[in-house]
Curated annotation (Swiss-Prot):
Lineage: Eukaryota, Metazoa, Chordata, Craniata, Vertebrata
PROSITE patterns: FBOX
Compositional bias annotation for Pro residues: 32-52
InterPro entries from the UniProt entry: F-box-like_dom_sf (IPR036047), F-box_dom (IPR001810), FBXO28 (IPR039719)
GO molecular function, a single term: identical protein binding
Protein's recorded name: F-box only protein 28
Length: 368
């Protein structure tokens, strides 16, 4: 390296060595005219190819920001969301990349929480009294508190995120939610909910208060007019970093619609599950109605049979009563004469009592 530098300095005119060059060489270098200025290329001619640069002479735009968006996101994915939120101060391009990653991070942590809650609920018993004494009761309490915190954050930030006026600013909140969810998944006997969620409640409350007091008044002024991304996208695309900015703006424009589609899909799944439960209940009710109708038909058949039996018994009683009357009348007609005149009233009385007893028995059967 030293020899090469000495040769380069000797070619340029002696460098710092006093005995490295002759006076004639120095004079010749002083008599050389300055190089002519570069002339612009003619319309029909081709520009000469640029000379290759040494590795230590790379252009200044060969930085992290000049990389493709996918590469930047892949690099930033190894960092925490708190660090990503702080990198928004670097430049506009980095700000757009970090905004997109923060918005996606909030949606991802919501999906991760839904997955954890679904797994815990699948292992819990259905009865509320049994859930309280279950080993996963604290897990369910912590996840329910996280769900409440996520809904508050959603109501505070996502209105303006969907309008593309800002991003989900507090990246530290996302990191803390991930920490709580991983703690719940990896611990069999977690601490109480207020102990685990103390840090999350503090930083999320501070973030929401600051957002409502300091940032929302500024964003409300932009709500009636066009948003920032719409004004940025009004400029024509040019190759280079500005084209990547336009691509990022398109992605950020599409995020609200994707989020709405995701919410609609979740609502459709919930409604489908409710419809399935209702159909199952309707089928059970139909089965019960059919069983009751069958029982009613059996009761009607039995009632008809009993009515027929009662009719037959009534007919038999009427016939027996008629025969008894005939026998009594014939007996009364045959008992004539003086000797039998005293006994005839007694026989008539007995016959009348027998007829009355038959009539009473008939009435009782008719009542039954």
């Amino acid at each position: 390296m030293a020899a090469a530098s000495e040769e380069r300095m000797a070619e340029e005119g002696g460098g710092g060595h006093g005995d490295g060059g002759s006076p004639s060489a120095i004079a010749s270098t002083q008599r050389l005219p300055p190089p002519p200025p570069p002339q612009p290329p003619q319309p029909g001619s081709q520009a000469p190819p640029a000379p290759a640069l040494a590795p230590d002479q790379l252009p200044q735009n060969n930085t992290l920001v000049a990389l493709p968006i996918v590469a930047i996101e892949n690099i930033l994915s190894f960092m925490s969301y708190d660090e990503i939120s702080q990198l928004r101060l670097v430049c506009k391009r980095m700000d757009l990349v970090c905004q997109r990653m923060l918005n996606q991070g909030f949606l991802k942590v919501e999906r991760y929480h839904n997955l954890c809650q679904k797994q815990v609920k699948a292992q819990l018993p259905r009865r509320e009294s049994e859930r309280r004494n279950h080993s996963l009761a604290r897990h369910a309490d912590i996840l329910a508190a996280v769900e409440t915190r996520l809904s508050l954050l959603n109501m505070t930030f996502m209105k303006y995120v969907d309008s593309n006026l800002c991003c989900f600013i507090p990246g530290k909140v996302i990191d803390e939610i991930y920490r709580v969810l991983r703690y719940v998944n990896s611990t069999r006997a977690p601490q109480r909910a207020h102990e685990v969620l103390q840090e999350l409640r503090d930083i999320s409350s501070m973030a929401m208060e600051y957002f409502d007091e300091k940032i929302v008044p500024i964003l409300k002024r932009k709500l009636p007019g066009s948003d920032v991304s719409g004004r940025l996208m009004g400029s024509p695309p040019v190759p280079g970093p500005s084209a990547a900015l336009t691509t990022m703006q398109l992605f950020s424009k599409q995020n609200p619609s994707r989020q709405e589609v995701t919410k609609l899909q979740q609502q459709v799944k919930t409604n489908g599950a409710g419809v399935t439960v209702l159909r199952r209940e309707i089928s059970e009710l139909r089965t019960k109605v059919q069983e009751q109708q069958k029982q009613l038909q059996d009761q009607d058949q039995k009632l008809l049979e009993q009515t027929q039996i009662i009719g037959e018994q009534n007919a038999r009683l009427a016939e027996l009563e008629r025969k008894l009357r005939e026998v009594m009348e014939s007996a009364v007609g045959n008992s004539s004469g003086s000797g039998q005149s005293e006994e005839s009233p007694r026989k008539r009385k007995k016959a009348a009592e027998a007829i009355d007893s038959l009539r009473k028995s008939k009435r009782l059967r008719n009542r039954k």
